[in-house]
């Protein structure tokens, strides 16, 4: 049993999976207030309860809008209502910077906590710099990475009384030959040298990622700064000191309330639109005859080249060699699932990552060998004890027999 548990622990530590693109439903820039609104302040500060025990890999390139998912499988749990919280941090090595935090109340026990599966949820604490770059979607972290966002993201989940912590290592492609502004990110404050390339020699599609539909200039006029967690530039109470900075970085044992996080009172759908607004309002880098409309059209055309997960198996045998050599198809990262909710656990991560199959087989072989060794040891101990018992019994009989003869002789 100990061998099996040790092997399963090894499997959980070796689990890795490719990060997923955000579904098209999250790529919008208009203010939406659909769904349940938050109605209370968080009851607890965001903390990392214990060092991460799960390692996950994620990738991003171009203008992709991505979701970092904590791989927590809740399907085995009972439906009894529970409370939950999710905190996201960025790991600078010596300290962790908080990025976003939210609490959920009265959630269905075997469903991923979300505004739809919970009775209520708190205001979202997010890291903002006059714009909304990050937000939480259910339990996942939503943002459009820049080349300076490569690094380790840590999630800290409290589900009822159970703690889940893990590390998501995000690798952002260094190629900046895309129309969006990729020269940004969390590590830019640390003056970390990132090799920026404009490799026009290797052609690839530039319209890769999320390109929200243009909106009217007055669409966000009725949205308050408080709803977005942004300091009011017209208020003397919100000065530059309230903006986040890299100095607000905490050690594992720190339980101080992060100054970098501001309270956003808007619903989840509004904050998702605010992330899309940042994407739409950025300084675009068009080449030649490119316009935003042509880029959006090209992006939609590229999406049609990527088969859906339902039709992927049936289309696999029908794909031609010409299609496989297409630079557009080759450069796109295929998406295995378009669901906005991720409930996969360690086993799902192993199944989705072909590069881990050898490791999985080796670990399963170790489990088998360990089990056989354990059974053999138990059998050996049983046989040894049987022999010892038989020998002791024989000695007792001999002693008894000698004593009997002695008494008979005396008599």
UniProtKB/Swiss-Prot annotation:
Residues 306-345 are annotated as: Disordered. It is found in: Virion membrane. Glycans are attached at residues 83, 138, 222, 245, 317, 392. Gene3D superfamilies: 2.70.230.10. It is a single-pass membrane protein. Pfam families: Herpes_glycop_D (PF01537). Residues 1-19 form the signal peptide. Keywords: Glycoprotein, Membrane, Signal, Transmembrane, Transmembrane helix, Viral envelope protein, Virion. Residues 306-327, 334-345 have a biased composition (Polar residues). GO terms for cellular component: membrane; viral envelope; virion membrane. InterPro entries: Herpes_glycop_dom, Ig-like_dom_sf. The keyword GTP-binding does not apply. GO terms for biological process: regulation of neutrophil chemotaxis. The chain crosses the membrane at residues 363-379. Belongs to the alphaherpesvirinae glycoprotein G family. Chemokine-binding protein that inhibits neutrophils' chemotaxis. This is Envelope glycoprotein G. It comes from Equine herpesvirus 1 (strain Ab4p) (EHV-1).
């Amino acid at each position: 049993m100990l061998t099996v548990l040790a092997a399963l622990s090894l499997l959980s530590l070796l689990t890795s999976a490719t990060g997923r693109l955000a579904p098209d439903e999250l790529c919008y820039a208009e203010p939406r207030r659909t769904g349940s609104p938050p109605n209370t302040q968080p009851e607890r500060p965001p903390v990392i309860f214990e060092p991460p025990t799960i390692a996950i890999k994620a990738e991003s390139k171009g203008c992709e809008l991505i979701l970092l998912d904590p791989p927590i499988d809740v399907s085995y749990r009972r439906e009894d209502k529970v409370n939950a919280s999710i905190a996201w941090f960025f790991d600078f090595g010596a300290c962790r910077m908080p990025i976003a935090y939210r609490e959920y109340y009265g959630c269905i026990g075997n469903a991923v906590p979300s505004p739809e599966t919970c009775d209520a949820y708190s205001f979202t604490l997010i890291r903002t710099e006059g714009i909304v770059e990050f937000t939480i979607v259910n339990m996942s972290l939503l943002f459009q990475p820049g080349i300076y966002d490569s690094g380790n993201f840590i999630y800290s989940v409290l589900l009822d009384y159970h703690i889940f912590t893990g590390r998501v290592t995000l690798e952002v492609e260094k190629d900046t030959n895309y129309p969006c502004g990729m020269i940004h990110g969390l590590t830019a404050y640390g003056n970390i040298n990132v090799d920026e390339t404009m490799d026009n020699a290797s052609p690839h599609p530039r319209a890769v990622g999320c390109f929200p539909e243009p909106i009217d200039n007055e669409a966000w006029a009725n949205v308050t700064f408080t709803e977005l967690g942004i300091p009011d530039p017209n208020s003397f109470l919100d000065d530059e000191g309230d903006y986040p900075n890299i100095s607000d970085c905490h050690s594992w044992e720190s339980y101080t309330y992060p100054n970098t996080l501001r309270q956003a009172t808007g619903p989840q759908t509004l904050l998702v639109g605010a992330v899309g607004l940042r994407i739409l309002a950025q300084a675009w880098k068009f080449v030649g005859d490119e316009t935003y409309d042509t880029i959006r059209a090209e992006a939609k055309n590229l999406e049609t080249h990527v088969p859906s997960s339902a039709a992927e198996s049936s289309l696999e045998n029908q794909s031609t060699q010409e299609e496989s050599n297409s630079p557009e198809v080759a450069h796109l990262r295929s998406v295995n699932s378009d669901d906005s909710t991720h409930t996969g656990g360690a086993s799902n991560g192993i199944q989705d990552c072909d590069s881990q199959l050898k490791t999985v087989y080796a670990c399963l072989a170790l489990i088998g060998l360990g089990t056989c060794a354990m059974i053999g040891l138990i059998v050996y101990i049983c046989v040894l004890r049987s022999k010892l018992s038989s020998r002791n019994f024989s000695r007792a009989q001999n002693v008894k027999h000698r004593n009997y003869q002695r008494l008979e002789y005396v008599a």
